[in-house]
Every structure is written in structure tokens, then in C-alpha cells.
A protein has these predicted regions:
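Dual-mode signal for accessory low-complexity, basic/Gly-rich regions
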Residues: 161-315
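Active-site bordering "gate/hinge" segments
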Residues: 1-198, 205, 214-217, 304-306
Length: 315
């Protein structure tokens, strides 16, 4: 942490948010932006963990993030969007210097242009089957919702069924083919600067990268000490608590699809007719995580290997 969050005043955050609001209200377009909800969060998570094994762990993880929800009016039609799209915000673990690294003075105007074009775009109807390419925002959400949560072993055992839902997996799912050989999904809390960063979980177990899916085969689940003991393996450090007086439960950290060997341009060049959905503004998923629905925000028609016009809200 280069710039201590304890030295950041409310006035500093308000000043940045006023600047951001100025970028939005001065945006020259034929859509109006009558309502803006903007926020900056910062926190220092401090933990001191002690157990009967003789473990003593002190950790401090600072985090900062920027969030926004903006209402747009185009020809009397209201819609909401966020910058960045998808409501997740811009976030990092680190000091106040991370907010500066977002370069909001350039980022916000660039995203407003994209948002304006997306809102004004028209829907496309396809009679035939088409190829769909999704951007990192949607790929990350798919990894989170369809791999992260259903791979939490306590959920698989029915521990959270009444509140958080169930899983489509069984406890004996290791070795099951779940995707093509191109699919690699990991969960890694050790990535420096990430929002999901931690070095020890809340049962005192050292964190590590968990390879959930390898070449389309399920190879690991997210475990705490209890669920791992039921499988006669070691916990992989996924037990986490929101507060000191709350029971730790199994939760993912940074869950993602591993990069492959193709660049985006190469993927697009192979598509004769399709859609590239870069990000999203709406999604739904069932309690067992089997079925999901994603509605694109910034999206483009693909024709003969090239990006074409904007497409409105592809599903």
C-alpha cells in the first residue's frame, strides 16, 4: 500500500466523484443521463487468527473500488447501465494509488461513448444458428456463477440449500467430464492486487490456486476443513467469514477461465455469422446453477470474420 487509506479524507473521495459526475453531465449525445449514482469504497480488512494448533496469523488487506449506476433516457425510453458494465465496479486490493490507476478522467468519457452507441442500437433477429463470442466480463461471470458457486463443497452437501441454493454437482464429481478439452477454470486467491486476494483463509489454512476444471474434466472443489475431511484430503483454504463473529463458509476468491491460445481477432476471423457480446447488464441463474441467462450490453454483429454494427441487448 503506497498511499495509506487511513490518510484519505471524505473530501478527497467527494472531489473525485464530482469530477466524474462532471464528465457524465457534460457528455454530448442525443441521450440524456438524468440520474447518476456514484460511489467510492475503501476498507482495510484486518484479521488476527489464533487456533489450538498454535497458529497465529495477522493480516491486513486494503481494498478500493469505484461503482456507478446511470439512468439513460433515449427518445423517452429509460434504461440503466453502469460503468464499467455489469455492476461489479472497478476494484483492486491496495492503497489509494489504485483509484488513481483507474484514470477515470479518460475511462469515463470512453465508456460513455460505448454506452451511448449500445443504447441507441437496434435488435437483430437471426433465423439460423449463429456463433457467439463472449468477452472477459461475461466469461468471468459464467465462471463465477456456473463454476465458482456450484463448486463450493458445502453447497454440494446441501449446507446452504435454504438460503444460497444448491449445486448441480454431486460430492463424487471429481473426474467428471463437464466441458471440451479447451476448458480450464481456476480459482486463485494469491493474485496480487486482486479484490479476492488473501494468503490464509479463516480456518488458518494457507491459500493456493485451485484448478477446478482441467481440459474439461472436474479436478478440484472448493473446500474447508470439514468438507475436505469427508473426502480424506487436505483443505485448500476456501473457508471465509464476513465478520469476526460470523461462521466461516466456503466461498470462491478470483474465479476465472484460463486464457487459451487464440487472440480475440483470431476468434472473430473464423466466424461467418455471429455476435460478439463484450459485456452485460442483466443476468439470471437458477438455484442449482444449471441454467443461466445473460443479456449483453456492448455487443456487435459479426459478418464474414469482421465486427459490424452494434446489437441491442442480445440474450
Amino acid at each position: 500500500m503506497k498511499e495509506n487509506l487511513k490518510n484519505v479524507h471524505v473530501a478527497d473521495m467527494i472531489s473525485i466523484l464530482k469530477d466524474v459526475d462532471g464528465y457524465i453531465t457534460s457528455f454530448n449525445s442525443d441521450i440524456s443521463l438524468p440520474n447518476r449514482t456514484l460511489g467510492i469504497d475503501n476498507s482495510i480488512e484486518e484479521k488476527f487468527y489464533v487456533n489450538t494448533e498454535g497458529t497465529h496469523i495477522l493480516s491486513r488487506v486494503p481494498r478500493v473500488s469505484f461503482h456507478s449506476i446511470i439512468t439513460a433516457n433515449h427518445n423517452g425510453q429509460l434504461s440503466a447501465f453502469s460503468i464499467p458494465a455489469g455492476y461489479a465496479g472497478l476494484g483492486r486490493s491496495g492503497g489509494w494509488e489504485k483509484i488513481k490507476s483507474f484514470d477515470l478522467s479518460s475511462y469515463i468519457p470512453e465508456q460513455l461513448v460505448i454506452a451511448s452507441n449500445s443504447i441507441k442500437s437496434k435488435s437483430e433477429k437471426f433465423e439460423e444458428d449463429i456463433d457467439v463470442i463472449v468477452g472477459p466480463d461475461i466469461a468471468g461471470l459464467v465462471a463465477h456463477e456456473s463454476c465458482g458457486h456450484p463448486f463450493e463443497a458445502d453447497r454440494i452437501l446441501g449446507r446452504e440449500a435454504a438460503q444460497a441454493g444448491e449445486s448441480y454437482l454431486g460430492f463424487d464429481c471429481n473426474g467428471t467430464k463437464i466441458g471440451s478439452k479447451e476448458v480450464y477454470v481456476s480459482d486463485d486467491p494469491t493474485i496480487p492486487g486482486s479484490m479476492g486476494f488473501y494468503l490464509f483463509d479463516d480456518e488458518g489454512v494457507e491459500s493456493k490456486k485451485r484448478k477446478l476444471i482441467t481440459a474439461g474434466i472436474i479436478t478440484d472443489l472448493l473446500h474447508n476443513r470439514e468438507t475436505s475431511s469427508k473426502m480424506n484430503i487436505q483443505s485448500n483454504g476456501a473457508s471465509r467469514s464476513t465478520e469476526f463473529d460470523k461462521e466461516p463458509v466456503i466461498r470462491m476468491s478470483n474465479t476465472f477461465i484460463e486464457p487459451g491460445n487464440y487472440e480475440l481477432e483470431e476468434l472473430i476471423s473464423d466466424v461467418k455469422s455471429g455476435v460478439y457480446i463484450k459485456n452485460f447488464m442483466e443476468w439470471n441463474i437458477d438455484d442449482r446453477r444449471e441454467n443461466q441467462r445473460y443479456v449483453g450490453f456492448e455487443a456487435y454483429r459479426i459478418k464474414n470474420g469482421e465486427l459490424d454494427i452494434h446489437v441491442n441487448s442480445p440474450v
